[in-house]
């Protein structure tokens, strides 16, 4: 499985990987969540031809969409164009993307017996060959320019979609499961963990050079529910992926955990087996550094809406952020994905400001 690895072009810019491992870098590396997104005119053009999940299933389309922001901007990493919901799809759940509304599951999980409808999690990776093909193709096309990040959704976040049938403000149905059906909840979270581990290992075998786990709905859980229903599975994914990579003779990869609005669990996340902890903009950099120290690299956390500000103001905000995080053990990013109405010029200004100010910071 990992035999194709040596055929990839040599990596020219490894700043992102070095920062992830905690090594010193000449400047602070930067990338953006949803950097391949609708804010780019070329993205809208490429995407116009087919519906969302058909695009996800086309390795050529995913490769092109992944490369577009890298061609345009001085990014230090690429992240494969895909979606976290390909995993529930591979578990035999129907998911459609409704324009203007988001994902929809026509038949969400309502009762414990609905879990019997799910495909064997061991078969999931074989259903997701199109993601692996997209990663291999993209890694070749990147020609070593920057590292390629693979990703997946964390078990709790995937569970919310599968039970709610979409994305809802309160996640009341999913949380009802946690309170009323704790055994079934753990069973479902276990199934998802079993599906995710070979999927993430497969991404590395296909050419991914780092992995990010998105716990996008961490904020719906308080610390007690989080430590019961999210954290154990986040830990388990990291532990099993690392063991699996070693067993398969694959290179170890830095892993990133991004638990949005999960600031109440920062200390636990820093000890969950990931090299990098992603932050959203509600966490002050200095406050985030206190509980985690220099044991992990932090990633984030500019408010994406700051990109609506003037380029001058963006520069000032970036400078402040870099000063607060310090020069080492840090990867710059936004605290969430880019929004469709953002100005690509302002995205460029953000990236340039990170590179410029982080070099100056090191000189002083």
Swiss-Prot record:
BP GO annotations: cellular response to arsenic-containing substance; heme A biosynthetic process; heme B biosynthetic process; heme biosynthetic process; heme metabolic process; heme O biosynthetic process; liver development; porphyrin-containing compound biosynthetic process
Protein localization: Cytoplasm, Cytosol
Site description Transition state stabilizer, residues in chain: 83
InterPro entries the record matches: UROD/MetE-like_sf, Uroporphyrinogen_deCO2ase_HemE, Uroporphyrinogen_deCOase
PROSITE patterns reported in the protein's UniProt record: UROD_1 (PS00906), UROD_2 (PS00907)
Listed EC numbers: 4.1.1.37
The keyword Cytoplasm is assigned to this record: yes
Reactions the enzyme catalyzes: uroporphyrinogen III + 4 H(+) = coproporphyrinogen III + 4 CO2; uroporphyrinogen I + 4 H(+) = coproporphyrinogen I + 4 CO2
Keywords attached to this entry: Cytoplasm, Decarboxylase, Heme biosynthesis, Lyase, Porphyrin biosynthesis
Main location: cytoplasm
Pfam families: URO-D
Alphabetized GO MF terms: ferrous iron binding; uroporphyrinogen decarboxylase activity
Pathway in which the depicted protein is active: Porphyrin-containing compound metabolism; protoporphyrin-IX biosynthesis; coproporphyrinogen-III from 5-aminolevulinate: step 4/4
Residues binding coproporphyrinogen III, per UniProt: 34, 36, 38, 83, 161, 216, 336
Gene3D superfamilies referenced in this protein's UniProt entry, alphabetically: 3.20.20.210
Lyase recorded as keyword: yes
Highest taxon listed in the record's lineage: Eukaryota
Family in the record: Belongs to the uroporphyrinogen decarboxylase family.
Known partners and oligomeric status: Homodimer.
Functional description taken from the UniProt entry: Catalyzes the sequential decarboxylation of the four acetate side chains of uroporphyrinogen to form coproporphyrinogen and participates in the fifth step in the heme biosynthetic pathway. Isomer I or isomer III of uroporphyrinogen may serve as substrate, but only coproporphyrinogen III can ultimately be converted to heme. In vitro also decarboxylates pentacarboxylate porphyrinogen I.
Protein name: Uroporphyrinogen decarboxylase
Organism: Rattus norvegicus (Rat)
């Amino acid at each position: 499985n990992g035999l194709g690895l040596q055929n990839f072009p040599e990596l020219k810019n490894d700043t992102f990987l070095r920062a992830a491992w905690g090594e010193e870098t000449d400047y602070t590396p930067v990338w953006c969540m949803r950097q391949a997104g609708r804010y780019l005119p070329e993205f809208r053009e490429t995407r116009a031809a087919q519906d969302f999940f058909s695009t996800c299933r086309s390795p050529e389309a995913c490769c092109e969409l992944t490369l577009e922001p890298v061609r345009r901007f001085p990014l230090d990493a690429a992240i494969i164009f895909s979606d976290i919901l390909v995993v529930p799809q591979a578990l035999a759940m129907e998911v459609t993307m409704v324009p203007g509304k988001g994902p929809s599951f026509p038949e969400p999980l309502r009762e414990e017996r609905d879990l019997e409808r799910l495909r064997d999690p061991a078969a999931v990776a074989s259903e997701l060959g199109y993601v692996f093909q997209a990663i291999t193709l993209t890694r070749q096309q990147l020609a070593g320019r920057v590292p390629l990040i693979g990703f997946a959704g964390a078990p709790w976040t995937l569970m919310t979609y599968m039970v709610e049938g979409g994305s809802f403000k309160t996640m009341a149905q999913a949380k009802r499961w946690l309170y009323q059906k704790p055994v079934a909840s753990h069973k479902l979270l276990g199934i998802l963990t079993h599906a995710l581990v070979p999927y993430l290992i497969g991404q590395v075998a296909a050419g991914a050079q780092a992995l990010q786990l998105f716990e996008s709905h961490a904020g719906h859980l308080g610390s007690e529910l989080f430590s019961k229903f999210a954290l154990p599975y986040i830990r388990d994914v990291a532990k099993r992926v690392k063991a699996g990579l070693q067993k398969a003779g694959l290179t170890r990869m830095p892993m990133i955990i991004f638990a949005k609005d999960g600031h109440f669990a920062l200390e636990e996340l820093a000890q969950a087996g990931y090299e990098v902890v992603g932050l959203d903009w509600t966490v002050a950099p200095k406050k985030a550094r206190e509980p985690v120290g220099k044991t992990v690299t932090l990633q984030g956390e500019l408010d994406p809406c700051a990109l609506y500000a003037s380029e001058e103001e963006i520069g000032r905000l970036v400078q402040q952020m870099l000063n607060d995080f310090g020069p080492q053990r840090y990867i710059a990013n936004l605290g969430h994905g880019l929004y469709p109405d953002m100005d690509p010029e302002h995205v460029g200004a953000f990236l340039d400001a990170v590179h410029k100010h982080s070099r100056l910071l090191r000189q002083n």
